[in-house]
A protein has these predicted regions:
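Conserved donor NDP-sugar-binding/catalytic core segment of glycosyltransferases
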Residues: 1-56, 120
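Beta-strand-rich binding-surface signature
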Residues: 16, 82-84, 100, 118
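Catalytic lobes of large eukaryotic enzymes
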Residues: 47, 51-67, 134, 141-148
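A recurrent flexible, glycine/aromatic-enriched loop bordering the glycosyltransferase active site
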Residues: 61-86
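Active-site rim elements
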Residues: 74-76, 96-101, 156-157
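Extended amphipathic secondary-structure runs
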Residues: 83-96, 175
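Donor nucleotide-sugar recognition loop
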Residues: 90-123, 127-130
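Active-site-adjacent helix/loop segment of glycosyltransferases
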Residues: 119-175
Length: 175
């Protein structure tokens, strides 16, 4: 990924590339014994697109989805995955993480701010990160942010944080 960033950034048109994708998945086989099954066979490029069933589902927020493409070459894109991106170190200074986003709105905000700072988004095959897409706490050994047990100890509940996040995204877009 680092060599690809270097190669892309040598092109004056794409001098500030971001490599991003929704990572391939993995399954927990046995958490106690640290046994996992990685989806390492899938080497397609996954572009990120808006989900047709979730366009503007909450004000200006639309959900995203990874879409497989039949290519082994990098693809120029427009959306990013906040949990999986590679870029030059200047990215964290020019597009700093905004802690006022809570789940919804984070990726769209980051993409808009990156675009306005001259960054270009690319999706590539074989991203070296895997993600647990399983929501079952029994299998994964973790609670998710919307779990009632997690939420009861918060001063501000997750649904209120989500509402504030979507309003922040709306304010960014309408500014």
């Amino acid at each position: 990924q680092l060599n690809l960033i270097k190669g892309l950034s040598d092109d004056a048109y794409f001098s500030k590339p971001i490599i991003t994708s929704y990572p391939r998945g993995f399954e927990v086989i046995n958490l106690e014994n640290e046994e996992f099954k990685l989806d390492s066979i899938d080497d397609l490029v996954y572009s990120i697109a808006y989900r047709k069933d979730s366009m503007f589902m909450r004000d200006l927020f639309s959900r995203q989805i990874g879409r497989p493409l039949k290519t082994d070459q990098p693809v120029h894109g427009y959306l990013l995955a906040a949990g999986c991106l590679f870029a030059d170190g200047c990215f964290v200074e020019e597009v700093p993480y905004d802690p006022n986003y809570y789940f919804y709105g984070e990726e769209i905000s980051m993409m808009l701010r990156a675009f306005t700072k001259g960054f270009s988004i690319f999706h590539t095959p074989n991203i070296p990160i895997f993600h647990l897409y399983n929501n079952d706490p029994e299998t994964s050994g973790r609670q998710l942010h919307w779990n009632p047990d997690e939420d009861k100890n918060r001063i501000t509940k997750w649904h209120e944080l989500e509402k504030q996040s979507i309003q922040r995204l709306t304010d960014l877009i309408e500014a």
